[in-house]
Amino acid sequence: MSTISTSTDSKLDNLGLSVTSRRNQILFYLSKALNLAHLLRSDSLQKSFLDALKQSATDSELLHKNLDEIKFLQNEKLNNEKLLEQEQNEANDYRLKVERLEHKISDYVQEINSLNSQLQIQKSNPEKHEDAVSQNRLRGSLDTVSSPSKTHKANKDEKATRLHLIIANLKKALKEKDAEVLNLQSHVSSKESELDRFKIKLETEESNWKVRLQVLESKLATQDRKLRMQKKSTERKSLLVSPRVSSPKLFSPSKQAIMGTRQPNATSGSPLSVTPFLQKTSTSIGLSSSPPQSSPSAQSSQPFSRDKYPHSMTVSPSNARYLKKHLDDTIPSNVSDINHNDHLKIPQSPSSLSPSKIPIRKKRKLKDTVSNCEFTEEDSESSFLLETIQPTKSTLRRSISPLKKRNDEINELKKGFTMKK
């Protein structure tokens, strides 16, 4: 029988060893699987972060391109403005030339009129008493005089016609230049409207991408916090559940279950999802984009206590008795000191004191204070206030220095006299 019992004991020991070894192997493989899952999650986070960086790089390139286009459009605008200025200068030059030609034409017309008047005077005043010879001579002389005047008049008319043609051509050129200037102004206004639209589009795109980047950063921050908490929990579990095949008695499943129940769940609380509307409102107010969370280091550093209040807030019965006795001894003396100080204080104005702040004094006899006190009629509105009698002059503090009081008295005496200038 003893041999049978020893054999069964040895078999049971072997079975226990095999079971514990298998359990340790299973736990080891589970920890490896958890590590792999964490690595996969970190890889996915890195990929998402790289994608966000690529998107931001593409956005920055687009912004640079847009800025280059804006610069090109601005240069075009400047060139158009320069062309407009040149054309305006040319138009002004043409106008000056036209004005000069008009002045010349007016001068020529005046000369022609003067010549015509001279000819009429010469024709209207021939001498009647002269002989026919003299008349013929006069006619010959007039012919000789009028022939060059006629040629001069013809030359003047030709010059005037030429000047009129030049003026007409210049006016046509001015009209064409004015039309070109109007076209250029309309083109410049259209370009300016396009620039304004383009700037508005750029600003909207920039604001949208900024909001998206902030949302991605907040999500990445929350995921990093989750990963840190999960890593800490896995490290604790790995410390508690470490594979020890050599000594089976070191590992106790009951302790593991107890510690597993006490461990806080790091990933129980899901973070708040940040929407674009909340993001815009938070940025306009000046708040942070990510939700406020306590750091995992601070949570892990705090000790776990079942009590609701810390040990420093609890008071033992002996301490309570000592405090009660100390308060009973100190309160009456403090009250007497306060009353004494209130007696010595100068009374404040009723506007600065509320009914709750006015100190209550005992009623005094009027024999001592009749000569010093002044009785005033109280209004119905202020009748609810407590009665405050002014203290005597002996109890008042000396608030005015003697020199100042003397100067005030001298000034009051001086007011009665007038100085003659």
UniProtKB/Swiss-Prot annotation:
It holds the Pfam family LRS4. Residues 133-149, 262-287 have a biased composition (Polar residues). It comes from the Eukaryota. Keywords: Cell cycle, Cell division, Centromere, Chromosome, Meiosis, Mitosis, Nucleus. It is found in: Nucleus; Chromosome, Centromere. Residues 288-304 have a biased composition (Low complexity). The keyword Nucleus applies. Its main location: nucleus. One of its GO terms (biological process) is meiotic sister chromatid segregation. InterPro entries: Lrs4/Mde4 (IPR018479). Residues 224-238 have a biased composition (Basic and acidic residues). One of its GO terms (cellular component) is mitotic spindle pole body. Residues 122-158, 224-316 are annotated as: Disordered. The monopolin-like pcs1/mde4 complex is essential for accurate chromosome segregation during mitosis and meiosis II. May clamp together microtubule binding sites on the same kinetochore, preventing merotelic attachment of microtubules. Transcription is induced by mei4 transcription factor. Component of a monopolin-like complex composed of pcs1 and mde4. The complex associates with the kinetochore. This is Monopolin complex subunit mde4.
